[in-house]
Amino acid sequence: MRTAVVVGSLCMATDLGMALPFGHGLGSTVVAMRLADRLGVDQATTVQTYYGCLLFYAGCTADADVQADLFPDGLAEHWTAVMFASQRKSMAGVFRALGSGDGGRIVRTVRAAAKFPRAGRGYKHHTEALCEVAEMVATGVGLPRTVSGLFRLLTERWDGSGPLGRAAGADLPLAIRIVHVARDASFQCLLRGPAAAVEVVRGRAGGAFDPSVVDALSVDMVEGSTDWARAMAAEPEPHLMLGGAQIDDALTTFAAFADLADVIGHSSAVADLVGQAAKHLGRADDEVSVVRRAALVQDLGKVGVPFRIWHQDVAPSADDWEKIRLHPYYTERALSGSPYFAELARVASRHHERLDGSGYHRGLSGSELDLPARLLAAADAYCSTIEARPGRPALTGAVAAGKLRAAANAGTLDPDAVAAVLDAAGHRPERIVRPDGLTPREEQTLTLLAHGLATKQIGRALGVTAKTADHYVQQVYAKIGVSTRAAAAVYAVKHGLATDATREFPR
């Protein structure tokens, strides 16, 4: 399979996470490739530009819990248009986003002022997490180091005023400079049309943007296409390819990216369980692979739902539920560009459907739901029950089994699928080999860290002081080679260390 197919599908999901129109990232990439061609860049820079632009927002789910608290209505509406503007205008956009919500202008201003100091203190950390997660995602989907290494410089600016201060001017890779101009030009085109977009970008030359790249931009280049085929055709040759286990690794990265928005490790846990359940039913290897891979991508659409909904301690409102019910549709839509992912998208988008037609998002029933969809629905329901969620503790496996049997008796879940899932859940093998030399205690620390616990909470869970817990955390960071909790969570998912969500963690 072409790597571009995998990365392009993930790009569609990042459009969701940034509240952009579907296909915007594809169109931006077409613009970036036109710029690269006009500048006459070398082959290596062309490859970097293509994949760097597709995955520009790959870190958008980093620190989703913090984003949910600070920006309950999202950041994109107020910030994306000014992210490459002057520092003053960019911060003004952040301030407006902090104050978004109910109330008049005075209420919103007071709300923003109350949050602004905390947002300022956490800004550098969030930026580091964004870059680190994007780099890990790029690596996870099979891109070479020459591409994934770009993402640590994702937020830098030509004039050196980037928040991390890692590069400026000609030290900033040319591919990043091209991507920045292409992404902003494409977004400005959405707001005001091609000619005005080019004028806005020209006004940012010498600030965020390399003047020589801006000089190469013209109105005809900005009219990008959101067509999947055109974006795939823009991929530099020779095409990068993925096969076999590499595809599974890439889809596990999809799972980690999606789960950062809600419950860390959920999709991987469902994939492990439903794969075992399918084997228990004697399904062929290719059928097992399809349902397992579908589980890994089933919640990709969650990134299109405001993060506050997944992290609030109160029951969702009627309006919230309408948004929640859309996430399987978003999953299907994000995967719809590629014929290869068509079967995965079909199964994945049905994990909340029920036999009696009471599920969502299509309200399918009975014969409209095949065995893979029925297995996935049962496995997802089981894993959701044994995971701690905002507003409720994790329930035991016994309680989860009782709930699934009751659902089967009521005709909402398939009895055979429920039996297979429960059989698989009762015979899950323990993992013995520990990655990167982590001790059992460090594994525990990483699991707690991945589930969002602060240092004091980790200490309480492990029965140690906060100082000792912090020591464990730093040891974990050093061994796995990361520096932020979001990146640690991605690592935990990849190595199967985030799925132990069967207990209620101390808050």
Predicted regions and their residues:
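Histidine- and acidic-residue-rich, metal-dependent catalytic cores
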Residues: 1-437, 443, 499
